[in-house]
A protein has these predicted regions:
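Acidic, proline/glycine-rich low-complexity IDRs
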Residues: 1-23, 28, 32-48, 98, ...
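Short, intrinsically disordered low-complexity segments
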Residues: 29-102
Length: 134
């Protein structure tokens, strides 16, 4: 009896989805600006876009009301390891990207759309830059 009860609990357990980091980097292989990121998303359905051009910020509001925020920064992460990574990826422009981890199903297609228009990649703002979206 004891084993059947345990088996039932295991079957009822919902599969867990790995949480994405909330902080990302968008490493662009072209010298682009916040305006270019906004333009790349103009034809993406189901999002609202807002830009603060002077600050280099683009807000992408998703259909669930949460947002993806792009903040343009200097392509220099101020440490040798990180800058070697940027050089390897041929970074010409860099954006800090903030997402809501619970919106992964909405965020990932947006990231893929951006890199379909602007060559580059998204990577976690983590010690090893993972995960990657190429």
């Amino acid at each position: 009896m004891k084993n059947k009860s345990k088996l039932k609990k295991i079957k009822e357990k919902k599969p867990s989805i790995a949480k994405l980091p909330s902080q990302w980097l968008f490493v662009a292989k072209e010298d682009v600006t916040a305006r270019d990121v906004k333009n790349a998303l103009e034809d993406y359905e189901g999002v609202e876009l807002e830009i603060w051009e002077a600050a280099g910020i683009v807000e992408v509001v998703l259909s669930d009301g949460k947002s993806i925020d792009f903040e343009q920064t200097e392509a220099d992460l101020r440490d040798e390891y990180s800058n070697a990574f940027l050089a390897k990826e041929q970074a010409k422009a860099l954006f800090y990207v903030t997402i809501h981890p619970d919106s992964a199903q909405l965020v990932m297609p947006v990231m893929k759309h951006v890199i379909g228009k602007i060559p580059g990649l998204f990577c976690g703002d983590t010690d090893d830059f993972s995960p990657f979206v190429r």
